[in-house]
């Protein structure tokens, strides 16, 4: 790699960190070079895990590729606020599907103790937390449990989920962008999430700021396939408008009050 190319790629990364996305055409104009050269730069950066290529440019890589155990201990107060907002969408006496994810686990803690509900999940940690909710009827979807995802995956799991018609699905999201859509890091996890999009009357996803305007390898659906997106209180207004322009209802989680 020439010094010029190395410097250009560093500046591309700086723009990506500042703006949340880069477009090949704009970069070519800014650096007075060809789009082919920029595309080669983006391929090289993506190959080193420094960005994720999308049509026309690149997005940052989502930070959500760590294990379920690690994710459960991160940003707990912020996830609690998102979980509270998710819990407010639930219709009593309905079928709710809870996808895997530490933010969805936080939502369980926000359920009122007297909430009457049937909940299906393939996430053992969520199922264990639901046992404390005496008015909840729990359906645990089985299959091979993937330790990194923290949930059952595979053909048996998918078949059982395909047979359900939830009134609401709380989707666990690895990466979300208004243009690039919803994405995941595991192909089997992505297939389960696609089934939830197809079969649920309503779908909601709550997302931390650092997962916004990022991408992951396996596309689940377009942003407009989500009925609700719950953002943090300080999430970008422009991102919120971009989701709303696509017909998605945008809610903001209220931060937890300090003791």
Regions found by a protein language model. Name each.
Residues 102-103, 126:
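A generic "binding-loop/recognition-motif" signal
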